[in-house]
Amino acid sequence: MGLVPFYPNAVQVPLLHAALAQLKRIGKIRQIIFKCRQPGISTFASGIGGWKTFFFDNVNTFVIAHDKPTVAHIFGMYDTMYDEMSPEVQPERPYYNKGSEMVLSNRSRIHVGEAKNINVGTGRTIHVAHGSEICRWQYLDP
């Protein structure tokens, strides 16, 4: 099938409207989404995170999931967005570690981590947090 343009689906549209309204109202987006399997929420969240990271200076984006393959898969979404950007708007990428870190010329960056590390993400200022498969995280207390 190949790469297709992103058009929000029926599940994503209300989330997008809510995100934009929240951004307008308080200047940031905070959404916790409980969902069924495969409605494209990681794609949606990566799109918002990529927009903020690629087009704004000094944004630290952190992606966390229960295991390395899932984290690498989500990082791949950011990677694809970056690779498909028009060169006219694409920031340079002076540092890149496939599947785990991307540093951009606008001083923004994307890091990833596994939730099985209780200290993951500490010591960083995080502006965009994308947590995936939270029900599978090792250190959650009921």
Located regions from the model:
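Phosphate/NTP-binding elements of NTP-utilizing enzymes
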Residues: 1-142
